[in-house]
Amino acid sequence: MTDQTAAGRGDLLSKVPAVTLAFWIVKICATTVGETGGDALSMRLNLGYAVSSLIFLAFFAIAVTFQIGAKRYHPLIYWLVVVATTTVGTTTSDYLDRTLGLGYVKSSFILLAMVIAILAVWRRTTGSIAFDHSTSRKNEIFYWLTRLVSNTLGTALGD
């Protein structure tokens, strides 16, 4: 994808990939790497879920800052942020379940409520929910926040 503008309005073209077979293959690989990384830090290195979540949240913040600051779609940056969301999702889901003792059902309902709230605020703030294209910084922030919380929800539901 190039650094062109959409309809001459100055909006950047989409910085998210098209959803194709290749997308799903890379998504599965990124999820596997993220879950493995989350478990490695929290369990194998025995840092615990809270510390691991904070480390991966910092990693996510750095990666998403590069993604949002980019002028065009960069696959490496995009997928790095996706891996970051899966590592945060893994450790945060386990923190809610095991450390706080909420269990996966309660955690899932809390996370679902958070996703719904984010989507509602996104819609109210921007007038739409743009999943297939992020043409403004505000949309991109909402997009990544939704991805972060929904990945955590997906981990809780999967466990």
Q: PLM features: residue spans?
A:
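Surface-exposed interaction/gating patches
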Residues: 129, 133-159
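Membrane-water interface at transmembrane helix exits
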Residues: 38-42, 93-101, 158-159
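Structural signature of hydrophobic alpha-helical transmembrane segments
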Residues: 44-58, 101-115, 157
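Short, Lys/Arg-rich, polar N-terminal cytosolic tail immediately upstream
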Residues: 1-16
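Short, hydrophobic transmembrane alpha-helix segments
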Residues: 37-46, 69-70
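C-terminal ends of transmembrane helices
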Residues: 8-12, 61-76, 119-135
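Cytoplasmic-side transmembrane-helix entry/capping segments in multi-pass membrane proteins
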Residues: 74-84, 107-110, 132-143
